UniProtKB/Swiss-Prot annotation:
Pro-peptide region(s): 1-9
Keyword flag Transmembrane helix: yes
Entry's family note: Belongs to the PsbK family.
NCBIfam families: PRK02553.1
Membrane side Lumenal: residue ranges: 10-19
Protein name: Photosystem II reaction center protein K
PANTHER family recorded: PHOTOSYSTEM II REACTION CENTER PROTEIN K, PTHR35325
Amino acid sequence: MIDALVLVAKLPEAYAIFDPLVDVLPVIPVLFLALAFVWQAAVGFR
């Protein structure tokens, strides 16, 4: 029981290296929207 608590307490430190990635993640859907627009511009908005 105590071991599990210690493990959960250490998890945020373990994931600290992913902080920059988490900062970027919300932008990805916007990139897909921009990609869709560029694709439509490339095919001439058929």
